[in-house]
Structures are given as structure tokens and as C-alpha cells.
Amino acid sequence: MMHNDQLKVFFVGGPNQRKDFHLEEGEELFYMRKGDMSLPILTNGEFRTVEIREGDVFLLPGRIPHSPQREKDTVGLVIERERLPTETDGLRYYVGDTTQTLFERWFFCDDLGSQLKPVIEEFFASEEFRTGKPGPSSINENPPWIPDSSRVRSNY
């Protein structure tokens, strides 16, 4: 009964280089066991990158858009809490280097590993990917929740 089925604990190996941003209501804890990683986030209306070095731990507050980037031969531990049945995760792409949403999908997440792939494939087959412009069905006008992009300290 180490965590009473309340946590997801998993190792992630590199490489992992993507353009999508994950939106989760709960906190995520990152620990780099081998190598370094970059964690681009959207905070205070602009993109910043948190560098997590080998041996470092970083707690990302909930509702912060983030895009973990790992190089080859890196290993990191990630701890997330189990989602409540009422919670929804999001996957979002932005227009170029702007904070304008290009494409997003919201879903209940019980297995991020298997549930991300269909959303990513949908994006790469989309008109939004082809044109780089948001389309009428690419953004939820009434998202389940609004990302909180202001709760990460500025010294990261």
C-alpha cells in the first residue's frame, strides 16, 4: 500500500522531442536519474524553459502547459497523481512561437502512453498542421478548465 493507487510512478527514457504541450490539472514531479532534460512551459504569457539536470527534482504546479524534452540516453522518473473521474487532460499545439492555440484536444487520461498517440496522429493529419492556422474545430471554445500560467517561480 505504498501509495494506495493514488499515484502513477514511471520512468521515461529519451529521446523525446515533441512540439505538443501537455495540460494536466494536477502537479507533476520530475527527477532526472541519468542526463538532463528541458521542460518548456508557458508561464506569465510567455514560453520559458526549466532545465532539470541529472540528480535534480522539479515539482511542476498543476494546470501549467508543459512539453518535456529529453535527449538520447537520458532517464527520468515522473510521478503524477491519479486523475479524478471529473478531471480532463489536454494536448495542445501552438502557432509557431506564439501563445496562440493552433490545435487542442481534451480527454480523460488513464494511460498517457497509449492515449497520446491517437491525438498526435490526428494533429499530423489535420488541416491545422498542414496550414499552421487554427481551424473551426481545432480549439474548444469552452475548455474544461483554463491553464494557470502564473504559478512557476521566476528563478527557474
Give the role of each language-model region.
Residues M1-V57, P65-Y156:
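Jelly-roll (double-stranded beta-helix
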